[in-house]
From Swiss-Prot:
This is Pleckstrin homology domain-containing family J member 1. PROSITE patterns: PH_DOMAIN (PS50003). It holds the Pfam family PH. Residues 15-108 form the PH domain. It comes from the Eukaryota. CDD domains: PH_PLEKHJ1 (cd13258). Gene3D superfamilies: Pleckstrin-homology domain (PH domain)/Phosphotyrosine-binding domain (PTB).
Amino acid sequence: MRYNEKELLSLSRQRAEKAAELSMRGPKKGSVLKKRLVKLVVNFLFYFRIDEEEPIGALLLEHCRVSKEDEKGFSIHFIDEPEKKYMFECSSQEQCVEWVEALTNASYEFMRRSLMFYRNEILKMTGKDPLEQYGISGESRFQLENASL
């Protein structure tokens, strides 16, 4: 997927849902853990050299798996490229758990599925589709393959 560099740079400067200095190792063979400022903005994970304002890279958190590797470490790999694994090390076990949860919940697909779950719960309780008032209940992006509304 192609991205406009200026748009990504602008997005990287927005308020982060989560940010911290983490040790990070890229997917290339022989790469080593390096301290990076890591920022989660919407469904992008930006990483920066410490004390630099422009990101050196970004990961779109779609079609990927976030896995806890050990007490303080987690990884991100993409479903269509499982051999490409990004490794991260946190300063504590608690920080690691927080990052894994935040990254797992950041994808558009997770948010869409959450919306569908709560939409169905409201429909069961009230008998009304909460998206109808916005005129968007029939849009394909709000449909699950096996959902029956």
